[in-house]
């Protein structure tokens, strides 16, 4: 029987150091865009000065409940996705941390429906109080829509056969309601398997990303960070798959260079608004201790003096 895993925060010390810098007890306002179970937030609060502030965001009601146990007056949390961080005052934040993806408590709770390893309701919503579940969406989606989601968000080469198999099963037996049923359908449609990977891995990833609009929220959060970060403020993002990392990498690259307007070739360029600092992968020891760290990539950038 699979046992739920205790959540271990990936790149904990590296991320907090990148966010706060080398100074002792920094002041300023910092943002933890993904509170989760509070691994990063608690360490930030330990190292933050008495005048510092930490604002956390999370869509998950269980994360909000966990955050309620923090009684530190310097801490506050908002029951919102990190796409709302841009609503903070302009140039008011000294650092933004985004730890993307799903936490172990979410993955390992069968009732959340994130994992093919446990049989449970096919939900996958980060915020269970709003929006469609995966089961509800699959009940009405067309074959082409399902294939597009699985292909674009899961980078799954068997997206077409999987989508056809889902619709065929739905037509024959009614709506697909459980993770086990979906995993069984996918396994039957995927003819070759990648070594060490369950055939349902990419499909489950794709549906989770789609149903939670994860990539759109990430793009909004990155844009929002330009608005709220003060000059010298840090942007720290930990991603866990290539789609996320590509967005972060391209965003930092786009804003780390001068931009010329082709329609006005003699106009001065728009100066860069970010300075790329580093890219960090977990150590061999961390990956050995926490298998979920193996795909993590952390990118760090610094806000320049240029106004948003």
UniProtKB/Swiss-Prot annotation:
One of its GO terms (cellular component) is cytoplasm. Keywords: Cytoplasm, Methyltransferase, rRNA processing, S-adenosyl-L-methionine, Transferase. One of its GO terms (molecular function) is rRNA (cytosine-N4-)-methyltransferase activity. Signal peptide: none annotated. One of its GO terms (biological process) is rRNA base methylation. It catalyses: cytidine(1402) in 16S rRNA + S-adenosyl-L-methionine = N(4)-methylcytidine(1402) in 16S rRNA + S-adenosyl-L-homocysteine + H(+). Belongs to the methyltransferase superfamily. RsmH family. This is Ribosomal RNA small subunit methyltransferase H. It comes from Acidovorax sp. (strain JS42). The lineage of its organism: Bacteria, Pseudomonadati, Pseudomonadota, Betaproteobacteria, Burkholderiales. The gene is rsmH.
């Amino acid at each position: 029987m699979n046992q739920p895993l205790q959540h271990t925060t990936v790149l904990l010390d590296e991320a907090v150091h990148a966010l706060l810098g080398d100074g002792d007890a920094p002041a300023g306002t910092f943002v933890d865009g993904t509170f989760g179970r509070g691994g990063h937030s608690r360490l930030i609060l330990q190292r933050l000065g008495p005048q510092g502030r930490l604002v956390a965001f999370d869509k998950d009601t269980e994360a909000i409940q966990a955050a309620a146990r923090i009684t530190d007056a310097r801490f506050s949390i908002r029951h919102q996705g990190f796409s709302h961080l841009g609503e903070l005052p302009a140039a008011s934040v000294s650092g933004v941390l985004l730890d993307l993806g799903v936490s172990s408590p979410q993955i390992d709770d069968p009732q959340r429906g994130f994992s093919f390893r446990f049989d449970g309701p096919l939900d996958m919503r980060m915020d269970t109080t709003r929006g469609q579940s995966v089961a509800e969406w699959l009940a009405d989606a067309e074959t082409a829509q399902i294939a597009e989601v699985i292909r674009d968000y899961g980078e799954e080469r068997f997206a077409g056969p999987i989508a056809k198999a889902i619709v065929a099963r739905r037509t024959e037996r009614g709506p697909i309601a459980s993770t086990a049923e979906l995993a069984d359908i996918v396994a039957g449609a995927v003819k070759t398997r990648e070594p060490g990977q369950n055939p349902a891995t990419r499909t489950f990833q794709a549906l989770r990303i789609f149903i939670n609009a994860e990539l759109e929220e990430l793009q909004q959060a990155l844009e929002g960070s330009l608005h709220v970060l003060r000059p010298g403020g840090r942007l720290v993002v930990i991603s866990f798959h290539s789609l996320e990392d590509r967005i972060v990498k391209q965003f930092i690259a786009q804003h780390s260079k001068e931009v010329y307007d082709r329609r006005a070739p003699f106009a001065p360029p728009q100066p860069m608004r970010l300075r790329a600092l580093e890219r960090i992968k977990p150590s061999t020891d961390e990956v050995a201790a926490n298998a979920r760290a193996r795909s993590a990539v952390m990118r760090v950038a610094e806000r320049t003096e240029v106004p948003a």
